[in-house]
Amino acid sequence: MADLDDIKDGKDFRTDQPQQNIPFTLKGCGALDWGMQSRLSRIFNPKTGNTVMLAFDHGYFQGPTTGLERIDINIAPLFEHADVLMCTRGILRSVVPPATNKPVVLRASGANSILAELSNEAVALSMDDAVRLNSCAVAAQVYIGSEYEHQSIKNIIQLVDAGMKVGMPTMAVTGVGKDMVRDQRYFSLATRIAAEMGAQIIKTYYVEKGFERIVAGCPVPIVIAGGKKLPEREALEMCWQAIDQGASGVDMGRNIFQSDHPVAMMKAVQAVVHHNETADRAYELYLSEKQ
């Protein structure tokens, strides 16, 4: 119990200065609860407003694909260079050391595989477990225009509703079926629907024509997917174009861990996302770091 002796009245109330309430500036997130804003502030660097996520959740439907055969050997050395880790709860518990001390976005949809229809997903994580694992967000695919569009949207709604109760953001990931065209019109539709359902972050693909319109039409932050493995210079150009056109970061997997020099590539991506380096400058950094 505090000592009650010698209690003195406060005097320095600065009555001439109004209380300062610093606004939360992340796009579309100013009205969220404190806990959710706190988690988002761990995902997005408060100084730059951007993020570099390392995605290695591919095994939930692809199995041990190239580069992800051994998470402990191939991916663990990259943890310190990422802002955020994106993975499944199985990998988090079995491979990621708790002392890593990086914010985690947990894969929350699944129940599909590359052997069947990819869009046929269900919610694969309870919000209780997401909280138990101290995650900063959960992520689920949304397949607009697919056979299972309705179910994938319901999955997002379910996660958003559960997340609002505990201050857990939901990231909607726009999946694309084999027969869908990857263009501005489609991604504008998909990202807007996901945001309208309440997702606080949207992960989508970069397109060369009209990406700035996708960003402008989406009321919450967009991070781009890395997609298939590209030559390092091309991947850095994609990053730069996306950030220049309004994206709030990248969530890259194969373009990092399938690179011949993944640590150097991670540092180059960080330079683009957080230090506004051009693709040329970032590629020079990559070349110097890989030696």
Curated annotation (Swiss-Prot):
E.C. no: 2.3.1.245
Compartments in which it is found: Cytoplasm
Highest taxon of source: Bacteria
A Pfam cross-reference name: DeoC
Catalyzed reactions: dihydroxyacetone phosphate + acetyl-CoA = 3-hydroxy-2,4-dioxopentyl phosphate + CoA
Active site: 203 (schiff-base intermediate with substrate)
Claim: Cell inner membrane is one of the keywords in the record: no
A Gene Ontology term for the protein's cellular component: cytoplasm
Molecular function GO labels: acyltransferase activity, transferring groups other than amino-acyl groups; fructose-bisphosphate aldolase activity
Residue ranges crossing the lipid bilayer per the database entry: none
InterPro entries: Aldolase_TIM, DeoC/FbaB/LacD_aldolase, DeoC/FbaB_aldolase, FbaB-like, LsrF
Stored NCBIfam families: PRK08227.1 (NF006081)
Quaternary organization: Homodecamer.
Annotated function: Involved in the degradation of phospho-AI-2, thereby terminating induction of the lsr operon and closing the AI-2 signaling cycle. Catalyzes the transfer of an acetyl moiety from 3-hydroxy-5-phosphonooxypentane-2,4-dione to CoA to form glycerone phosphate and acetyl-CoA.
Family: Belongs to the DeoC/FbaB aldolase family.
UniProt name for this protein: 3-hydroxy-5-phosphonooxypentane-2,4-dione thiolase
Source organism: Escherichia coli O139:H28 (strain E24377A / ETEC)
